[in-house]
Every structure is written in C-alpha cells, then in structure tokens.
From Swiss-Prot:
Gene3D superfamilies: Ribosome hibernation promotion factor-like (3.30.160.100). The modification N6-acetyllysine is found at K66. This is Ribosome-associated inhibitor A. Transmembrane segments: none annotated. It comes from Escherichia coli (strain K12). During stationary phase prevents 70S dimer formation, probably in order to regulate translation efficiency during transition between the exponential and the stationary phases. During environmental stress such as cold shock or excessive cell density at stationary phase, stabilizes the 70S ribosome against dissociation, inhibits translation elongation and increases translation accuracy. When normal growth conditions are restored, is quickly released from the ribosome. Has been suggested to inhibit translation elongation by blocking the A-site (aminoacyl-tRNA site). It holds the Pfam family Ribosomal_S30AE. GO terms for biological process: dormancy process; negative regulation of translational elongation; negative regulation of translational initiation; response to cold. Induction: During stationary phase (at protein level). Also by cold stress, remains ribosome-associated for the 4 hours tested, then disappears when cells are warmed (at protein level).
Length: 113
C-alpha cells in the first residue's frame, strides 16, 4: 500500500515511517481497500499532532490524534480510524430492522382471532 507522509516543523525518521506503516497495516483486517492514505505529522507547542485522510470505496475517513509523544499521537489516530472503519462497515446492518413494533403487534392480534 502506498501512503503519503508529510511533516510540519519536524523531520520524519525511518522509525516513525515504519511505525505509521505498521499501524496502518492494522486497518487491513477490515478488508477495505484504502485509497491513497495521507498522513500529516506536525509538532506544536503543546505536543504532537497526527492527522489522516483516507479514501475508501464507501467514503472518506478523516481523523486526528494529539499527544505529547509522537508515537502515542499516531496510535490515537489509528484507533480513531479503526472505529470509523468499523462504523462504515456495519452501517448497513445497523439500519436493517428485523420487524418494527407495529408489525409485531399486528402479528399478535391476528393470532388471537
């Protein structure tokens, strides 16, 4: 998977690049094609910020993670992306209702007659 990693006010080390790649590989368990992931890593006075924009066939995932430690900010970012992917994958199942309350009452009335 190809990914773009951009940094602002800091240098990307091979260790950071490898950590991002390893954590993004965790998202592959959802069996969704990740189209052109773009990760932005920046250093701010309060700590580090990791932002991501990832296109998928079902929509766009956008998340941000902030922490004093760069690796923890990346982990927060990936956890947020994983929750979004889970929600996106199960969206159709959540909207599918077995029967509504009206239909259930109607079935009971028919049986009583």
């Amino acid at each position: 998977m190809t990914m773009n990693i951009t940094s602002k006010q800091m240098e990307i080390t091979p260790a950071i690049r490898q950590h991002v790649a390893d954590r993004l590989a965790k998202l592959e368990k959802w069996q969704t094609h990740l189209i052109n992931p773009h990760i932005i890593l920046s250093k701010e006075p309060q700590g580090f910020v990791a932002d991501a924009t990832i296109n998928t066939p079902n929509g766009v995932l956008v998340a941000s993670g902030k922490h004093e430690d760069m690796y923890t900010a990346i982990n927060e970012l990936i956890n947020k992306l994983e929750r979004q992917l889970n929600k996106l994958q199960h969206k159709g199942e959540a909207r599918r209702a077995a029967t509504s309350v009206k239909d259930a009452n109607f079935v009971e009335e028919v049986e009583e007659e």
